[in-house]
Amino acid sequence: VVLGKKGDTVELTCNASQKTTTQFHWKNSNQMKILGKQGSFLTKGPSKLRDRTDSRKSLWDQGCFSMIIKNLKIEDSETYICEVEDKKEEVELLVFGLTANSDTHLLQGQSLTLTLESPPGSSPSVKCRSPRGKNIQGGRTLSVPQLERQDSGTWTCTVSQDQNTVEFKIDIVVLAFQKASSTVYKKEGEQVEFSFPLAFTLEKLTGSGELWWQAERASSSKSWITFDLKNKEVSVKRVTQDPKLQMGEKLPLHLTLPQALPHYAGSGNLTLALEAKTGKLHQEVNLVVMRATQFQENLTCEVWGPTSPKLTLSLKLENKEATISKQAKAVWVLNPEEGMWQCLLSDSGQVLLESNIKVLPTWPTPVQPMALIVLGGVAGLLLFTGLGIFFCVRCRH
């Protein structure tokens, strides 16, 4: 039994017992001649394989009389007979085809269905291995739900029939962003860069996209920017005035927010709809903003935006242990010492965001010159009055 792949080429072997250029014939199960040798020439019969068969003439003198069938079809599956040296050799050919349901370019989250074409009477099994090493088994239909970005690449599928196997290679492209979610940490006032790299490359890439943003302080989300994508070039269709985002003109998709401000902190969802594809690509992006301030005798450190409850916010004097550290979005210190203070947002000891603020020494409030003059005048008047009374008393006595 020989297993072949639809659209591929197969070689059925037939060998003579001696190295000779004897006559040979290949026939199908109905005894119709397919090809053979007459003298030193290759001859062909009126079979349906006439235009798709050949033989290696260079091996005839070695007693090798193979038949090559090109562009295999499922209906080519049958028993073929080689007649040579008054003997007959039978070779059973089974042709299988394995194809993706509709397209080999699928969006992340969509399902992949592989369908096996097989000849009547066969009972094959299929086992596929994904690029990320996941094994899937099935019969004539094999389904893979919820494709992940890591499923993009070459799938290796083995079809088995009567202990014989044939291997298929199918290239699947999962259309997705490289990251499902990302978080940007910035100090108040810093410029913010958002990047949305794709996990695939296509020669022609056309579509449209939009970024919706839900600020932490806002009651509802709003569209910050819409854009078109044509042949890997990006053009902005509409952008809000506050904030006024800037967008790169080439891939990867790139957005710039001029300043990180507390009222911008929040999360966004960038969607990309590709031409001729059902559904959209999604990537979530988060912005966390930190502010460190001193007001009168109070030093405060705050963060805005989506943060994990596990994150720690700390205030510490430079080169000293943290004065305060807890899992909260705001911490403060009363009457801080002078010096450089650090506001730190950390995850299991790893600093994600840092902001420094210098606390200056506090001096006693200086007495104003006018106050000194007034006090001096009052003291002089009191002294003069006292002396006058003293001398008046003495005069009476």
Swiss-Prot record:
Domain note for this entry? The Ig-like V-type domain mediates the interaction with MHCII.
Q: Which residues lie on this side of the membrane: Cytoplasmic?
A: 392-397
Keyword terms, alphabetized: Adaptive immunity, Cell membrane, Disulfide bond, Glycoprotein, Immunity, Immunoglobulin domain, Lipoprotein, Membrane, Palmitate, Repeat, Transmembrane, Transmembrane helix
- In this protein, the residues bearing a glycan are N269, N298
Assembly information from the UniProt record = Forms disulfide-linked homodimers at the cell surface. Interacts with LCK. Interacts with PTK2/FAK1. Binds to P4HB/PDI. Interacts with IL16; this interaction induces a CD4-dependent signaling in lymphocytes. Interacts (via Ig-like V-type domain) with MHCII alpha chain (via alpha-2 domain) and beta chain (via beta-2 domain); this interaction increases the affinity of TCR for peptide-MHCII. CD4 oligomerization via Ig-like C2-type 2 and 3 domains appears to be required for stable binding to MHCII and adhesion between T cells and APCs.
Stretches of the chain found on the membrane's Extracellular side: 1-369
Give the UniProt record's GO annotations in the biological process aspect: adaptive immune response; cell adhesion; T cell differentiation; T cell selection
Keyword flag Glycoprotein: yes
Q: Which domain of life is it from?
A: Eukaryota
Q: Enumerate the Gene3D superfamilies for this protein.
A: Immunoglobulins, transmembrane domain of human cd4
Q: Kindly give the PANTHER family that the UniProt entry links to this protein.
A: T-CELL SURFACE GLYCOPROTEIN CD4
What protein does this entry describe? T-cell surface glycoprotein CD4
> What are the cysteine partners in each disulfide bond?
C14-C82, C128-C157, C301-C343
List, for all copies, the residue spans of the domain called Ig-like C2-type: 99-176, 177-290, 291-347
Where would you find this protein in the cell? Cell membrane
Q: What does this protein's UniProt record list under function? A: Integral membrane glycoprotein that plays an essential role in the immune response and serves multiple functions in responses against both external and internal offenses. In T-cells, functions primarily as a coreceptor for MHC class II molecule:peptide complex. The antigens presented by class II peptides are derived from extracellular proteins while class I peptides are derived from cytosolic proteins. Interacts simultaneously with the T-cell receptor (TCR) and the MHC class II presented by antigen presenting cells (APCs).
Please give, as recorded in its UniProt entry, the membrane topology of this protein: Single-pass type I membrane protein
Does Repeat show up as a keyword for this record?
Answer: yes
Q: Where is the lipid attached (S-palmitoyl cysteine)?
A: C392, C395
